[in-house]
Structures are given as C-alpha cells and as structure tokens.
Amino acid sequence: MDIFYDLIKWLVVLIYWLLIANITYRILIKRRSIPSSMSWLLTIYIIPFIGIAIWFFFGELYLGKRQKKIAKKIWSISNTYLNKLKSYKYIFQIKNSEVATSLFQLCKHRQGIYGIKNNKITLLTNTQNTIEVLIRDIYSARNNIEMVFYIWKPGGIADDVAMALIDSAKRGVHCRLMLDSAGSVEFFRSPWFDIMKKSGIEIVEALKVSLIRIFLRRLDVRQHRKIILIDNYISYSGSMNLVDPYLFKQSSGVGQWIDLMTRIEGPVATAIGIIYSCDWEIETGFKILPKLPNKEMLKKKCNQNSSIQVIASGPGFPKNVIHQALLTAIYSARNELIMTTPYLVPSDDLLHAICTAAQRGVKVSIIIPLYHDSILVKWASRVFFSELLEAGVKIYQFKKGLLHSKSILIDQQLSLIGTVNLDMRSLWLNFEITLVIDDRKFSHHLSAIQKEYIDNSRLLDKNTWSMRAYWTRILEKIFYFLSPLL
C-alpha cells in the first residue's frame, strides 16, 4: 500500500512539473511583453496548482474549437466583400488631413479599406437623449435593425427600446440582437428574452458562460462592442450600454454613468455592418453580409471634408490593430492630446508614447473618473500616475458620476471614439470597435464635451500626489505586479 501511495505521489509531482514546463514554454514562445511574461511566470511558480488553474482560465486567448475555426477564415471572406465596396470610389477619402494621414494609412494596410466619406455625423452626449433618438429611428426602420451590446439591463427606458423593437418586428422589420452572455445576464434571466424572441426578434447570446465552457475556452474574452445598424444607412457606436442611466448600478455609489455615442448617416454603415456580420457568423455560423450602399442616395449627400475609418479588434480580426492605431495616433499629435477613459491600465508602449508626447511639447491631458466601479482597476490605474505626472501629463479626475466615455482628440482635428478602454483586456482580448474620424467640425464638438468633463473634474496635483501615504504606495506596487494580468 505504501508503494502505491508513493507511486501516486510521484505521479502527481511529475504531472505538476510537466504542466509547469508546458506553460513556461507557452509563455516564452508567445512573445508577450516582459512584464506580462514575468507576472505569469511568478504566478505559476509561486502559487502551486492555483497558478496553473489561473493560467488555463485566463492565460490563453482561446475561443473554442468551432468559433476559433470560423474566426480564422471570416476576415479573409469579408475582405472579398470589401473589394466589391471599393467599386464605389467616390465614397472613399484618398487624402486626409496631415495629422490623420499616418493612422488612415495604417488602417488601409491592415484592414484593406480607405477612410469612408459622404457621412453625416452627430455626437450624442446624453444617454437619455440618445435612447430617445434611437427609438425614433427604430420606429422609422423599413427593412432591418441589428444591434450588439455588452450590457442590456431591463428596466426604465431600456424597456421602451425593447417595445420599439417588438413593434418593428411585428410590422415586418428584420430585427437581430446580439448580447454578451456575462454582461447581459440579467436580460437573459428576465421575461424580456422570451417576449422578444416570440415577437420574431433573432437573439444571440454571445460567448456563453457556463461551468462546462470553463474547460473549453477563456471566459474573460467578452463581446464588448456597442453597435446599432438601421436599414444599412444609419449606424450608432460608442461607449453606451443599453441601460437606463437613472437605474443602472446606482447602489455602487458612483453616480450616473456618463457616455458618448455617435449617430451616423451614410455608407460607413456598410463597413460597420461587415463587422457585425463577422460577429454574427462566429456565434451562429450564418453569414448576414449587408447590402451594398444605394449609389443614388449617397451622391446626394457627398461630404468631401471628413472621413471615417472603422477599426475592429478581437479574436479573428487583424492582430494588435487597435494597439497599433492608438500608438500611431498618439505619435501623430503635435500640439494637443486629450484622452478620456474609465480604466487607465496602459501597456508599456502606450505609457511610453503618452509620456514622450508630453516631453516633446504636446499638451497632454487624461480625463478619468474619480469614482470607480472596480477596486482592482482603481488601484492598478494609480500605479501609472507618478510617471505620467513627472512627464508633464495633466490628469483630471471627473467628479460628477462614473465617466464611461472612451475618446481621444488630437490637435483639434482627429477623433477616436468607441468601446476601447486603455486597459489590457480591451487592447488584447475583447471584441471592440473604434471609429477614427478626420473632421475638424466634429472634433470641435468633441473638444467642447471634453472641456465640460474637465470643468467638472479636479486636477491631480503632482506635489500632493508625491506625499500620499506609504501604505498606498505598497498597494500600488502590488497592483503594478497584477496589472499585466488585468
């Protein structure tokens, strides 16, 4: 019996070290950043068994066998469709403003499409008003409505959107709704799920979460896009989830969530529709590519002074493209750079780019919320304050709610708006979308909104920050170690 137990013991030890060796090998060949690699190596070596479990759950970017197979081929198929779109030469902006040229060229080479002009762009800054405008558009829809959200929380004005979709489906409009399984768990447990399905709305639970799936793929890869498409002509995107701002997470004590959305009329809806089609096919296996734009309608509203690039990031899409785009945008700044983000856990490259911009004379401002819904992110963000302040970056902490907007403004000309947070999960894992807008008039509107944010913020003082308590510095160092894992 003793021999048997000894055999089992040594077998467990052998398996354990084989797993350690295998994970070590995988970490080294992945060419991760050095801080990320070191964090993972320390985790698996210092925390026996638990470290291995953490790696299998969160260390590998793995969607699942079927979804991974579809995701690999889907973008190349979409590029074939993009080639058809290229026949509409008059909707593409070949020449951009000086500050936007490098970024648009990057997107052209990585995604195969020029910036799209001939769009009417509106910036929506109030969630209540945004949803009211959306409901009017839903009732005006004639052919199709597609939506994807990370969070749909029933209650309040969100129920008005549900009713508008139900009414539209009943009058023959083809309605599709894709919601993240984790973010919209309350929706899938509510009566609205069955009510909307019975009315004829196609609903997909994206990246399903369950105990079984823990062993099949990573659960922290989320569908984080926010997209609305109506009749292949009207499109919405930005940071807003489908929630009532007066009801959503009010118990957390952070106040109302502050968001930005863009409403666009024009051919960019087709480019966004291709992204939606890719996501739909990954989940269902069915293609729903949008119709090509109506040429006659587009010719009537041609706008030569602005253009939009759509950047899709996530598994199956061009690798690291959003990270490259952010770096290119920051290095393009010559006079002013204003960044708004709820979560500030940048990569080393982004941190270096931001600090370098300030050190070469660019006026750099970062606006973040004073109050957070995540303790982990709050402390992880604080780690970077000292280096940013030393470089001359101004850090503003928004006081009037949880600032959830994600935007970048460069030299009052180039704007980036979308779903991407400046954290590792948005940069490397999630399905995200970013609109790059080369339009001075739109940028002035965004600048006015960012000024409102700053007016309702407190400026973090460099000297005061340097005198913070010693115990907070220790906590910051701990979270600095964890930041590559967030």
UniProtKB/Swiss-Prot annotation:
It is a multi-pass membrane protein. Disulfide bonds: none annotated. It is an enzyme of class 2 (transferase). It comes from the Bacteria. Residues 219-246, 399-426 form the PLD phosphodiesterase domain. It catalyses: 2 a 1,2-diacyl-sn-glycero-3-phospho-(1'-sn-glycerol) = a cardiolipin + glycerol. Its main location: membrane. It holds the Pfam family PLDc_2. One of its GO terms (biological process) is cardiolipin biosynthetic process. Belongs to the phospholipase D family. Cardiolipin synthase subfamily. ClsA sub-subfamily. Catalyzes the reversible phosphatidyl group transfer from one phosphatidylglycerol molecule to another to form cardiolipin (CL) (diphosphatidylglycerol) and glycerol. This is Cardiolipin synthase A. It comes from Buchnera aphidicola subsp. Schizaphis graminum (strain Sg).
